[in-house]
Amino acid sequence: MRYKYCPECGIKLTDRQAGDDGLVPYCNECQMYWFNTFASCVIVMVVNEFQEIAMLHQSYISDEFETFVAGFMTPGETAEQAAVREVKEELGLEVEHLEYAGTHWFAKREQLMHAFIGYVKKRDFVLSTEVNDANWVTFEEAPKRMFPDRPGNTQHILYRQYTAHINGK
């Protein structure tokens, strides 16, 4: 989010030098800098003991491609807590082991994605109202259902990391 008006008093902000950060929106009334902000999100590739991957169809995201579990972090929540919560909310599954897979910038939506591989026991899904459908798919089938592999697509980054892991690299 790029601030144009002060969220506290509503006055139009002016650019002011803020040390090494350069010009930053500033409120002369409140005497506060308002640095640009962005959302922190999680994305989780959910994998079961048979190396099947949970693929979600969410029509508000795409009618053509499927995705992994993802969602916004809430204030006071760690990325790990958000990842476990999102898997429970969207699929009704308990994460047994969570493996951190780095952070990735999603420029299109100005979001910082905290990526994880979440290991679960294979169970039937209990879907959230946000999810139209979900399926366990084979490791080999998953990339065919994903969004195209382009810069910023965390799905493929996670998939490649998991591929390296199971191939012992």
Give the residues covered by each predicted segment.
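A generic fold-level signal
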Residues: 1, 39, 48, 108-111, ...
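Acidic, metal-coordinating catalytic segment for phosphate/diphosphate chemistry
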Residues: 1-43
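A short linear hydrophobic-aromatic micro-motif
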Residues: 15, 55, 98-102
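Short connector loops at helix/strand junctions that flank enzyme active sites
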Residues: 22, 37-41, 63, 68, ...
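Conserved Nudix-box catalytic region and its N-terminal flanking loop in Nudix hydrolases
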Residues: 47-89
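Unchanged
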Residues: 73-97, 102-154
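Charged phosphate-binding loop/patch that engages nucleotide di/tri-phosphates or the phosphate backbone
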Residues: 154-169
